[in-house]
Amino acid sequence: MSRLTDLPAWQALEDHYYELQGTHLRELFAADPERGEKMNAEGAGLYLDYSKHRVTDETLRLLRELAQATGVEARRDAMFRGEKINVTEGRAVLHTALRAPRDAVIEVDGKNVVPEVHEVLDRMATFADAVRSGEWLGYTGKPIKNIVNIGIGGSDLGPVMAYEALKHYAQRDLTVRFVSNVDGTDLTEKTRDLDPEVTLFIVSSKTFTTQETMTNARSARKWLLGSLKDDAAVTRHFVAVSTNAEEVQKFGIDTANMFGFWDWVGGRYSMDSAIGLSLMVAVGPEHFREMLAGFHDMDEHFRTAPAEQNLPMLMGLLGVWYGDFFGAESLAVLPYDQYLASFPAYLQQLDMESNGKHVTLGGEPVDYQTGPIVWGQAGTNGQHAFYQLIHQGTKLIPCDFIGFCQTLNPLPPHHDLLMANVFAQTEALAFGKTLEQVLADGVAPEVAPHRVFEGNRPTSTILADRLTPRTLGALIALYEHKVFVQGAVWDINSFDQWGVELGKVLAKKIDGELQSEGEPELQHDSSTNALIRRYRARRQG
């Protein structure tokens, strides 16, 4: 047994699970009719109803004891202090500094990093205002109308999600697009109807050597110069988010138009940094800063709220409860707002890249479940796709429902109907429909078993008044810190991502073999060798 599963707090939860596993949510609500009024918490403008979870007060107490025993709060405080809790890379983890107010003091190696953060934010704001106002002109003297962000992973998923989420607040005479996939189709389709004279590319790569990003960037430069015919045009149509001034300059970008960030910011936590430049251009510096304020609101809530009312702590511990004791393998995130359609995809990287780990901080194999598979879709579309399996399938899938009390686009009766579905789905998942109830409805006995809903499917419901930049910031930070809580309990490093490296190394080797003019000497396994040979033989059509 590992250190974690050896803990009395863990073993107490195991015993408690065996006592509680057969208890239905119907029973829990019957035993306490006011359960829904009690099992909720609020912070940073978000309201969390966790009453439809398969927990009792005793469950929650035992989960908090596990958090105490695994040092979650101590590790949280170490993160906020700037200690190097990313032990495999020897780095501090300070995405929280990206949204700290100007007068905050957050030190890394004895240096307050906050002034530098705000210096970059101020430079970003000056640039964004220049583009938005038409002051920034392209090579031929025309104002910019199209923004294309080129990045991948954390340099893409966050800005894409946030741009879509805040589109209501965007400057509509600017077209904003995102290119990430090294598949040439992505860049081709995103630029097909754009005019190079009024298009600006933001190339986001810390090292400016990321293979996919730089392949796209070079092709974008070729596309631009195919029309403008002068290398000098690059300086008016490309800016960089990077820390590698030498490579940026080599590409043809003026380093005065390079926006940097720091090694204490992980890629999937970087959208508050210069990585969010495309978003700031789209929605404006004021709305971007409002979003940062929302992040900071949740940071402070996570840092100061007691465990029993702490939203990230509650959500993180509930995830541990289902993953490690009930054996749930996935989490469905279901935002009932079309603006949040990309939120589940963003959370996939945030959660799965952070907590998809199989060894502890000390390098020992774990003997328990770590991060879940995260997936989902905007409601109500998902109801007509995969909810069938959640309701009547054989897998236990905890769900997070996200909704807003006010819509940004009043179109009666749409919003009431949308939110009616949120509340109906969580009720149906919790309480289901028994065979007796189905038969009482007059359903034929031979059909009745097919109409039974077992229920007892756990859900969280997160409500906010309105989707604003500030609300979005708080919502993202809630999930960031939820992931942190789980990583701390599991004693894993949530801030490295070595799992992406091996494939990258092999791809570089295979790319050389694919481009070889002569027949390469292949030394892979027989399957990979056969696939390479077939591709080489057939790629010309």
Swiss-Prot record:
Protein name per the record: Glucose-6-phosphate isomerase
Keyword annotations from UniProtKB, A to Z: Cytoplasm, Gluconeogenesis, Glycolysis, Isomerase
Record-stated family: Belongs to the GPI family.
Pathway: Carbohydrate biosynthesis; gluconeogenesis; Carbohydrate degradation; glycolysis; D-glyceraldehyde 3-phosphate and glycerone phosphate from D-glucose: step 2/4
Gene3D superfamilies: 1.10.1390.10, Glucose-6-phosphate isomerase like protein, domain 1 (3.40.50.10490)
GO cellular component: cytosol
Position of the signal peptide: none
Known role: Catalyzes the reversible isomerization of glucose-6-phosphate to fructose-6-phosphate.
PROSITE patterns per UniProt: P_GLUCOSE_ISOMERASE_1, P_GLUCOSE_ISOMERASE_2, P_GLUCOSE_ISOMERASE_3
Known EC number: 5.3.1.9
Native source species: Deinococcus radiodurans (strain ATCC 13939 / DSM 20539 / JCM 16871 / CCUG 27074 / LMG 4051 / NBRC 15346 / NCIMB 9279 / VKM B-1422 / R1)
Pfam family, one: PGI
